[in-house]
Curated annotation (Swiss-Prot):
InterPro entries on file: A-amylase/branching_C (IPR006048), A-amylase_C (IPR031319), Alpha_amylase (IPR006046), Glyco_hydro_13_cat_dom (IPR006047), Glyco_hydro_b (IPR013780), Glycoside_hydrolase_SF (IPR017853)
Catalytic activities: Endohydrolysis of (1->4)-alpha-D-glucosidic linkages in polysaccharides containing three or more (1->4)-alpha-linked D-glucose units
Name by which UniProt lists this protein: Alpha-amylase
Comment on bound cofactor: Binds 1 Ca(2+) ion per subunit.
pH dependence: Optimum pH is 7.1.
Enzyme class: hydrolase
């Protein structure tokens, strides 16, 4: 019996590590703060045809409306209820988007905020995205309903009621994260309300969840909630499929709470990945790309099958969260494209690409005073649509990194080489490196201050290939560089260090 229970335990967690992607698709994109109507259109016109596996959406539940500062992005992370009406749209628009994305093979992953409700200073009234009344002062949220009995205040031992010391795991789990009212997830009633919210989304067709702030919840409480979740909707997924769970746990080392406590329940965000990747491409702290021959677990990251990896996310591109100044973002486009290219070419982890909006940064003593600014919006605070320009970029302040040719084409590269081993490594001892993926793909980087000029074994069949970084394969022709691979698998590469994009990628489907 014990053995059976162990297998059942392990089996459930293991199933929750599976992203349930379709048709050999391998990378998801976070369309941060996009409206549901725009995501639905993007699935149909771009994400589906271009081979993206899925989209991570911003929290869909009712949230507080903050006036000072004006409608910041982080108001989405302060729930008022589990009603499905948010800054991105209402329940009907959400359902329509989930259906339309699923119909073109693109999964939807929900950012689930279940650790807390709004901030203790959230006040009383109907300043919420659906107009529900609430009173944060006495912890009254009748639209759930939650009352003061459903929060952790009695368990928290700090004077302020907030987390004061990250060295104390009890504080981190039982006290308020930056003043946010901390739900008592040990209570059966609260667990039930959270599971009902998640199950409604599963029944609508979502494929899984990014679970926010998991470090601040006890693993046993999360396990209980996950066990209550329904299997995925069989209209789009095989019978018995479990929701994909990936948990936000910031663990850069140095704290008692580690990712290891959560990997049995689902995948976990590997924040070390983007922090190290940024250092490597910036060449900080003596780092060199030549040191990445054993990139992945060899660098002290969690096991491959447990990791969700990303260059940047919505927090750390603003200096919040983890990684500090080393994090590469769209503000550093040349290095950013290389770093994302490296991530998408390398077999380690399940990959997430960021899609951002720009804002007017204002650095004072190294801190961006405008890191709160919400998405492009109208005077009334409503989020603007995402317009697509004739050149396929986005307008109105939406950055759309996922549409940049170099990133879009590397998502396709990852699909083409899926399942192939890391092979044919080469480096120059500095910041020129190359590696292949079996006999399906090969990529070369020059991050040195001098030209790369070398003949390498690619492992690819002989022929002429289109470099998908400098251009696109268009029928039988190529709009970028062409690379000739000999019958022996060898090819000559030249990359000047002054090029806009000093890297080259070729793969089986880019053969002319």
């Amino acid at each position: 019996m014990k053995l059976f229970v162990l297998i059942a335990l392990f089996g459930l967690g293991f199933a929750q590590h599976n992203p349930n992607t379709r048709d050999g698709r391998t990378a998801i994109v976070h369309l941060f703060e996009w409206r549901w109507a725009d995501i639905a259109a993007e699935c149909e016109r771009f994400l589906g045809p271009k081979g993206f596996a899925g989209v991570q959406i911003s929290p869909p539940n009712e949230h507080i409306l903050v006036s000072s500062p004006w409608r910041p992005w982080w108001q989405r992370y302060q729930p008022i209820s589990y009603n499905l009406c948010s800054r991105s749209g209402g329940e009907n628009e959400l359902r329509d988007m989930i259906t339309r994305c699923n119909n073109v093979g693109v999964n939807v992953y929900v950012d689930a905020v279940i650790n807390h409700m709004c901030g203790a200073g959230g006040g009383e009234g109907t300043h919420s995205s659906c107009g529900s009344w609430f009173n944060a002062n006495n912890k009254d949220f009748p639209s759930v309903p939650y009352s003061n009995l459903d929060f952790n205040d009695g368990k928290c031992k700090t004077g302020s009621g907030n987390i004061e010391n990250y060295g104390d795991p009890y504080q981190v789990r039982d006290c308020r994260l930056v003043g946010l009212l901390d739900l008592a997830l040990e209570k059966d009633y609260v667990r039930g309300k959270v599971a009902d919210f998640m199950n409604k989304l599963i029944d609508m067709g979502v494929a899984g969840f990014r679970v926010d702030a998991c470090k601040h919840m006890w693993p046993g409480d999360l396990d209980n909630v996950y066990r209550r979740l329904n299997n995925l909707n069989t209209k789009w997924f095989p019978g018995g499929s479990r929701p994909f769970i990936f948990q936000e746990v910031i663990d850069l080392g140095g704290e008692p709470i580690t990712t290891g406590e959560y990997v049995g329940l689902g995948r976990v965000t590997e924040f070390k990945y983007g922090a190290r990747l940024g250092e490597l491409f910036r060449k900080w702290n003596g780092q060199k790309l030549s040191y990445t021959k054993n990139w992945g677990e060899g660098w002290g990251f969690m096991a491959d099958g447990n990791a969700v990896v990303f260059t940047d996310n919505h927090d750390n591109q603003r200096g919040h969260g983890a990684g500090g100044a080393s994090i590469l973002t769209f503000w550093d486009p040349r290095l950013y494209k290389m770093a994302v290219g490296y991530m998408l070419a390398h077999p380690y982890g399940f990959t997430r690409v960021m899609s951002s909006y720009s804002w007017d940064r204002n650095f004072v003593n190294g801190k961006d005073e405008n890191d709160w600014i919400g998405p492009p919006s109208n005077g009334d605070g409503s989020t603007k649509p995402v317009p697509i320009n004739p050149d396929q970029t986005c307008g109105d302040g939406w950055v759309c990194e996922h549409r940049w040719r170099q990133i879009m084409n590397m998502v396709q590269f990852r699909n083409v080489v899926n399942g192939q081993p890391h092979a044919n490594w080469w480096d120059n001892g500095n910041n020129q490196v190359a590696f292949g993926r079996g006999n399906r793909g090969f990529i070369v980087f020059n991050n040195d201050d001098w030209a790369l000029d070398v003949t390498l074994n690619t492992g690819l069949p002989g022929g002429t290939y289109c470099d998908v970084i400098s251009g696109n394969k268009d029928g039988g022709s190529c709009t970028g560089k062409q690379i000739t691979v000999g019958g022996d698998g060898r090819a000559h590469f030249y990359i000047n260090n002054s090029e806009e994009d000093p890297f080259i990628a070729i793969h089986a489907d880019s053969k002319l």
